[in-house]
């Protein structure tokens, strides 16, 4: 069994359901220390974070990943136990195989190989891991970035190992992500009998024109490779369940995925002004998941394009699609950020898996990226 496959299996066997780490980072730190890295464990709240560095000075290249996984769901739905890694027909199965213990293991092996071959390399190679990516993402990289800001720690380049590939390893290069902003709107009315609407105020009727305007609005036309900003209503609830009662309250949950044309405060102000214009009696609660980031043409992006093209046999698609990642907390430090990882077809699903051949190739891919950036 290869080094990367053995380490991936060891990590999968640790049931690190978010925000638990289950000893993953301790095992990784032991390996990185043996390779000559300085390791710092940053326990913030109930979350484990690991900052491992080799070398000094600029440029600083960070390999960013997470050791936590989403819950596996019912055991009986899986072909084999989610935390018992199994290889069948050239495919490794287990929770975290693709998202993202395979990438983390490949980072570690690539870093070990790189510093063994280039012990006096230029700049700093760093590995940053958290156990709070799949959950609330409060005491993970978000908090670590605050610590870095206080210390004056700079980062030039960040490669996140999120599973970015779609059909074959290296076919997609993630060069940015949209921002995410969620809102919970409560519109207040007056409950009453449906036969006496003049004695009640129906919050559904009151809110409908405002919601229609929100849904119909075109926020922008997109930005570079970003699709247009989108607002989606995700949940609507009102009423008692009886068809003869006008509800006294309406609750609406919604989410915006937005381009760099916007930031959360401006979007919040726009939506608040719209609701005020409709003279609603309402309360609105916001949750900011992260601002958008975008890496323009530069050394990191051009090197990644070349390396992925060599591995995939064709230039990668360069995309800003998908959800959010921890790179959104690193980008505001001034870092150029990309995401490169295995195929994402099975992430968060029952029988999550990664092709063994892809896993075996990942360390060489990451090592080549590191060498092109820190050696030339």
From Swiss-Prot:
> What cofactor does this protein call for?
Zn(2+); Co(2+)
According to its UniProt entry, the protein's GO biological process terms are:
diaminopimelate biosynthetic process; L-arginine biosynthetic process; lysine biosynthetic process via diaminopimelate
| Gene3D superfamilies cross-referenced by the UniProt entry | Zn peptidases
* Entry coiled-coil feature ranges: none
Show the active-site residues.
68, 133
Query: Which Enzyme Commission number(s) are on file for it?
Result: 3.5.1.18
rRNA-binding among keywords: no
- The broad enzyme category this protein falls into is hydrolase
* Catalytic activity, as annotated: N-succinyl-(2S,6S)-2,6-diaminopimelate + H2O = (2S,6S)-2,6-diaminopimelate + succinate
Pfam families the UniProt entry points to: M20_dimer (PF07687), Peptidase_M20 (PF01546)
Q: Does the keyword Iron apply?
A: no
The record's free-text note on cofactor binding: Binds 2 Zn(2+) or Co(2+) ions per subunit.
Q: Give the record's keywords alphabetically.
A: Amino-acid biosynthesis, Cobalt, Diaminopimelate biosynthesis, Hydrolase, Lysine biosynthesis, Metal-binding, Zinc
**What does the annotation say about its assembly with partners?**
Homodimer.
Q: HAMAP family, per this entry?
A: DapE (MF_01690)
The entry assigns this protein to a family as follows:
Belongs to the peptidase M20A family. DapE subfamily.
Q: Give the protein's function.
A: Catalyzes the hydrolysis of N-succinyl-L,L-diaminopimelic acid (SDAP), forming succinate and LL-2,6-diaminopimelate (DAP), an intermediate involved in the bacterial biosynthesis of lysine and meso-diaminopimelic acid, an essential component of bacterial cell walls.
| Protein's name according to its UniProt entry | Succinyl-diaminopimelate desuccinylase
Organism equals Xanthomonas axonopodis pv. citri (strain 306)
């Amino acid at each position: 069994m290869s080094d990367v496959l053995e380490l991936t299996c060891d990590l999968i066997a640790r049931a690190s359901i978010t925000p638990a780490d289950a000893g993953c980072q301790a095992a990784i730190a032991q390996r990185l220390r043996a390779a000559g890295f300085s390791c710092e464990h940053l326990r913030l709240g109930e979350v484990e974070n690991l900052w491992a560095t080799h070398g000094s000075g600029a440029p600083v290249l960070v390999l960013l990943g997470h050791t936590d996984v989403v819950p596996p769901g019912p055991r009986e739905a899986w072909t084999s136990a989610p935390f018992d890694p199994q290889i069948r027909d050239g495919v490794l199965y287990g929770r975290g195989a693709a998202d993202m213990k395979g990438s983390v293991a490949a980072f570690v092996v690539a870093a070990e190989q790189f510093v063994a071959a280039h012990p006096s390399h230029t700049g700093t190679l760093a590995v940053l891991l958290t156990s709070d990516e799949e959950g609330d993402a409060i005491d993970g990289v978000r908090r670590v970035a605050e610590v870095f800001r206080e210390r004056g720690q700079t980062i030039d380049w960040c490669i996140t190992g999120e599973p970015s590939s779609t059909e074959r390893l290296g076919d997609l290069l993630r060069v940015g992500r949209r921002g995410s902003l969620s809102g919970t709107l409560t519109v207040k009315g007056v409950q009453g009998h449906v036969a006496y609407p003049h004695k009640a105020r129906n919050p559904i009727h009151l809110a409908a024109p405002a919601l229609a305007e929100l849904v119909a609005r075109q926020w922008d036309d997109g930005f570079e490779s970003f699709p247009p900003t989108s607002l989606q209503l995700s949940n609507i609830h009102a009423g008692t369940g009886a068809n003869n009662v006008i509800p006294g309250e309406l609750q609406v949950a919604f989410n915006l995925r937005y381009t760099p044309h916007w930031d959360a405060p401006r979007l919040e102000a726009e939506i608040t002004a719209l609701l005020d214009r409709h003279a609603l009696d309402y309360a609105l609660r916001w949750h900011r998941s992260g601002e958008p980031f975008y890496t323009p043409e530069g050394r990191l992006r051009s090197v990644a394009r070349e390396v992925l093209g060599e591995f995939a046999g064709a230039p990668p698609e360069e995309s800003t699609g998908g959800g959010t990642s921890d790179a959104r907390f690193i980008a505001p430090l001034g870092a150029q950020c990309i995401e490169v990882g295995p195929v994402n077809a099975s992430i968060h699903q029952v029988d999550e898996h990664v092709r063994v051949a892809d896993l075996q190739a990942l360390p060489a891919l990451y090592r080549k990226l590191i060498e092109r950036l820190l050696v030339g």
